Amino acid sequence: MIKNNLIYALKDGKLTHISEVESGLNCACICPSCGESLVAKKGNRMIHHFAHKANSECIYGYQTSLHLLAKDILLEEKRILLPKVQINFYAHDGSHKEVEISNEKFLELDNVVLEKKQGEIIPDVIAYCGNKKLYIEIYVTHKIDDNKRNRIIKDDVSTIEIDLSEVDRYISKDMLKKILLEETAQKQWIYNSVENKWYKKFINDADSFEMKGSRINNCPIRTRVDKHGNPYAVFIKDCIYCEYCVDVIRDQEGFNLGIKCTGAKRISEISDYSKTINERIAISNQKLYEMRIEDLSKGLCPFCLTELVKRVGKYGVFYACSNYSYCNFTYSIDEETGELKCKYQLL
């Protein structure tokens, strides 16, 4: 099978490209996986490659050669470009918000070793930086399975997977070097210990709110106000898009029971932890106030986004929510002072 053809083999213990050796058995090369002698096939009508002398089926030769090539590059360059790190807070039906921890960055390496057993797993490549280590998994034919993923999480070691499943089977060293050192599109975090730490911190700082029908009562940012003046939010319309919703509480059957919300503490980004609670509330309230004033300017109720209608009452002109059976919001403007007077406070 062409996907198992080798373009790199071991010669005198060194990974060697097919272009660097003589044809046939004179190449004096062995398979990097099984150790069997190889034949260098360099005819005029074929793409040059190594083949096993006995035509045996070795399904790991190509993959192992890529592991070795990646190791050689990382040892030479002593660095790797890592993808950005972000927390994904899954909210509903796959939708989620992202909180960025760090952008793409280079990790300077002290050492790189290949396929060395670590507890219950054998990572493809282990990169060391000081007293920390990074597992690098190279996906050629099989992605990391759940069993290996769970063991990586248990070991609390940051791990990236590099997807080479769609790259040219005759990838050159320069092409792989570009992927390792200049690109992140083919890299993804299988697990990141820093992300996990921050995720736990957000969840621990969140309050639990029970769902009643589709409603979450006592919304800490007063997304909506009912006709009795009680704050609430609608799960499907508000919570899943809210910057403070960090998790959805579900039962074993997957039914939604409530949410985890950081609204009371006004925490939505990593940078919020560097501010005091009073600073966070002030910033959040200013943003909410501006949003609600903008809704009023559009003729919409700031609490349910229903159209406001103009009415005339005992004390003159006022504007009322047209969703009157559920929302009693009204406002008027003092003719003398221009002051905005609302039945419910905007904050």
Regions found by a protein language model. Name each.
Residues 1-77:
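N-terminal cysteine/histidine-rich coordination modules
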Residues 14, 158-160, 164-347:
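Non-catalytic C-terminal interaction segments of nucleic acid-processing enzymes
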Residues 26, 120-122, 296:
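Short beta-strand-initiation
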Residues 45, 130-131, 314:
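Short strand-connecting beta-turns/loops that link adjacent beta-strands
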